């Protein structure tokens, strides 16, 4: 077996089998130069190696080459066969071990993050773990933390890359995204100013790095804050906050645009306008509400609700306002669908009209009796008197709820409801609430 030969060879030469491979199936007529060229073409682009020896295998009547690798076998890139004279030559390596694969990925991850196994052991408190629980190569690093302090170049999360070019390359960030990450991570770094500056320069490429090198050459003691201020002046947004405010104030809804869609488009402009302004969150909410009332054409119900909030000085925040607007839009859509479903044909309208008039004439005496009973009881209710504050609250409550019930007026009237009874009764109720009237006039019977 080729694998057994590989293991025996590694034991005989005291080598790690994870850093060795065996190439078998080499024809006997291949010279040493041909073998070297073939192995170089197949392995050199992938990893550094060294040929340690050759031998003859009686099982397949071919030669075998034993090769030492500079690093452990990378199973993702190493081919299982390489093209050579007489066909493909088989590459034999030690089978993949799940634990070895995990440690390999962990090492690559820690290398990219600028950390090591020592940092992991210190963070997890694993310095006193038994030797059999860790790999032999990891143990010297795990035992070292109590003996030597960590370096400043360790224990940090690397920043994203920023170059300052007009079109960022793949893997690079825009200045706004890069600056946001720097502002978030910088306070976490408990290191000296020199180390912070080194880490900052480590994330720069292209024109941004050239500018920072010039600034550092002119001032060796330049701080990270000064570096960021310089980058903001060069690559940051040049727009003044007054221009942002003007752009916000000039923003209007497009033709046919929903109120909720316009609010989504307006919010980034508002946040940008107030970013550098001395305005509180409450002022921002009030500005948003007043701008919608001034610029947007909306339904009377929605406008009544928003104007009531404006008058009371209780502006909703962005999420509350969005919920209010979308609920109103959903109600309008539902109302439109119901209107389309309830549209009768011309013949049906005539029949329903005759039926309504017939039922109205029958129900008129009953309506008169009900109105008289309400008229007799109304003085007792109103003459007790209501405080003016309660009356104003009821008026505000009626104004606020009128928008919520505005859809009821669009539905057809009930068949047993007379068309002439609503007007006087409603007018009398409003008059009694506003002027404190003690009684209501009796409605006259219907004339047939």
From Swiss-Prot:
GO CC annotation terms, alphabetical: nucleus
Biased composition (Low complexity): 352-361, 426-439
Example GO molecular function: identical protein binding
GO BP term, pick one: positive regulation of apoptotic process
Record's keyword annotation contains Kinase: no
Keyword hit for Nucleus: yes
Localisation per UniProt entry: Nucleus
Principal location class: nucleus
Superkingdom in the source lineage: Eukaryota
Comp. bias intervals (Polar residues): 363-383
Entry comment describing in which tissues the protein is expressed: Expressed in the brain.
Location of region: Disordered: 335-448
Disulfide bonds: none
Family that this chain belongs to: Belongs to the PNMA family.
Protein name, UniProt field: Paraneoplastic antigen-like protein 5
Organism expressing this protein natively: Homo sapiens (Human)
Lineage: Eukaryota, Metazoa, Chordata, Craniata, Vertebrata
Gene this chain is encoded by: PNMA5
């Amino acid at each position: 077996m080729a694998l057994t030969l590989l293991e025996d060879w590694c034991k005989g030469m005291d080598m790690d089998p994870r850093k060795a491979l065996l190439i078998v199936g080499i024809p006997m007529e291949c010279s040493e130069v041909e073998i070297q060229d073939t192995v170089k073409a197949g392995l050199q682009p992938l990893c550094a190696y060294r040929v340690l020896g050759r031998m003859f295998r009686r099982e397949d009547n071919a030669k075998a080459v034993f090769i030492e690798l500079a690093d452990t076998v990378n199973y993702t890139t190493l081919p299982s066969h390489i093209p050579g004279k007489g066909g493909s030559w088989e590459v034999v390596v030690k089978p993949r071990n799940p634990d070895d694969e995990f440690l390999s990925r962990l090492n690559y991850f820690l290398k990219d993050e600028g950390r090591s196994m020592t940092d992991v052991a210190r963070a997890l408190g694993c310095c006193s773990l038994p030797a059999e629980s860790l790999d032999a190569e990891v143990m010297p690093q795990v035992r070292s933390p109590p003996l030597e302090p960590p370096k400043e170049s360790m224990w940090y999360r690397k920043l994203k890359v920023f170059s300052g070019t007009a079109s960022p390359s793949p893997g690079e960030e825009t200045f706004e995204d890069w600056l946001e990450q720097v502002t978030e991570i910088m306070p976490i770094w408990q290191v000296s100013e020199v180390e912070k500056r080194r880490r900052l320069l480590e994330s720069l490429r292209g024109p941004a790095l050239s500018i920072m090198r010039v600034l550092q050459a002119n001032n060796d003691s330049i701080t990270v804050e000064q570096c960021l201020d310089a980058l903001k002046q060069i690559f940051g947004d040049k727009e003044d906050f007054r221009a942002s405010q003007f752009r916000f104030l000039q923003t209007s809804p497009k033709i046919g645009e929903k109120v909720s869609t316009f609010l989504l488009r307006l919010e980034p402009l508002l946040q940008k306008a107030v970013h550098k302004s001395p305005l509180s969150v409450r002022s921002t909410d009030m500005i948003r509400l007043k701008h919608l009332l001034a610029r947007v054409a909306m339904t009377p119900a929605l406008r009544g609700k928003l104007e009531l909030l404006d008058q009371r000085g209780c502006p909703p925040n962005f999420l509350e306002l969005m919920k209010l607007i979308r609920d109103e839009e959903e109600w309008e859509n539902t109302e439109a669908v119901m209107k389309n479903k309830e549209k009768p044909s011309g013949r049906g309208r005539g029949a329903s009209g005759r039926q309504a008039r017939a039922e109205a004439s029958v129900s008129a005496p009953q309506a008169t009796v009900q109105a008289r009973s309400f008229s007799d009881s109304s003085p007792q209710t109103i003459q007790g008197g209501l405080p003016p504050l309660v009356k104003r609250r009821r008026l505000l409550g009626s104004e606020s709820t009128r928008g919520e019930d505005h859809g009821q007026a669009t539905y057809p009237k009930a068949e047993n409801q007379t068309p002439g009874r609503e007007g006087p009764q409603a007018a009398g109720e409003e008059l009694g609430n506003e002027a404190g009237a003690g009684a209501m006039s009796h409605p006259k019977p219907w004339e047939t």
